[in-house]
Amino acid sequence: MAAELHVELVAADRQVWSGEATLVVARTTSGDIGVMPGHQPLLGVLESGPVTIRTSDGETVVAAVHGGFISFADNKLSLLAEIAELADEIDAQRAERELERAKAEGDATAERRADVRLRAVSAR
């Protein structure tokens, strides 16, 4: 079993993160899944939620992911997201304002998106 896996986190408009990791945790339609080197091949649908990547050097990278697909084979993990942003890129105060506005307007999609962004920030 290899000690690390290659991870590509890609949004529709850009490559968000790429590198070597020892563990990736993501939310799928079947529930949360942890992928480590040597994992069985998989293909799944991503739910909106934070994705946590434990890099090979022990750092933790967290991203807010909004829908997409996850694919793993031969120690290569691809996370193809409709929207994705690293927690370090998220302005928490702006996300709080967006959450409050979405709640006031009854916009469930915007509320879910702001909530995921805030959870990613708090997980970093």
From Swiss-Prot:
Keywords: ATP synthesis, Cell membrane, CF(1), Hydrogen ion transport, Ion transport, Membrane, Transport. It is a peripheral membrane protein. One of its GO terms (cellular component) is plasma membrane. GO terms for molecular function: ATP binding; proton-transporting ATP synthase activity, rotational mechanism. InterPro entries: ATP_synth_F1_dsu/esu (IPR001469), ATP_synth_F1_dsu/esu_N (IPR020546), ATPsynth_dsu/esu_N (IPR036771). It holds the Pfam family ATP-synt_DE_N. It is found in: Cell membrane. Belongs to the ATPase epsilon chain family. F-type ATPases have 2 components, CF(1) - the catalytic core - and CF(0) - the membrane proton channel. CF(1) has five subunits: alpha(3), beta(3), gamma(1), delta(1), epsilon(1). CF(0) has three main subunits: a, b and c. HAMAP family: ATP_synth_epsil_bac (MF_00530). Produces ATP from ADP in the presence of a proton gradient across the membrane. This is ATP synthase epsilon chain.
